[in-house]
Amino acid sequence: MALGGLGEFGLNALVLEWQAECLLVDAGMGFGNSELPGVDSVVPDFEYLEERGRSVRAIVLTHGHEDHIGALAFALEAAPHTPVYGSRLTLGFVRRRLRERGIDADLRLLTPGQPVEAGVFRVHPIRVAHSVIDSLALAIETPVGVVMMSGDFKMSHGPAADEQTDVEASAPGATAACSPSSPTAPTSRSRAGRGRKTT
């Protein structure tokens, strides 16, 4: 269930739920626009998490952009003591932001190729290229199938040579795939069989 992020830029927050257990993927903020004059930022309504209390097994972050981590403090207020998983850089951003708000959180490192258990969910982090390094897609095993959550990504080379999307580590047999899409100006073009050409 999406708490935000559908049909809009930002507010990325999606809940996977099985019986009495749930997992939150991303906790992003939205930004003011011409339809919201005077508003700088917007956060998802985390009342759904608050109602579930300790059944929230984990918050898993795909990358360190504000539209994916900016509302984490509010998610943790709704579901205190929930472990937060993310890549090293993402957790660095999160740690600083939470410290500014006086929030002590259980932050846990996600490493591509090393799955983690969160209740009935098994999360497989997969490296993806994006405009911020250390970005992840997630293959999430549930009791009824595998859900592929891409986070933001691009299918061209990332800012660092080793930050390419690991297409070999995708989720074969995934039951569902969820992927945000936002229009972006291309920074390079990739052609099958021809390598990379910068524009």
What is the meaning of each model-derived region?
Residues 1-60, 65-199:
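His/Asp/Glu-rich metal-coordinating catalytic cores
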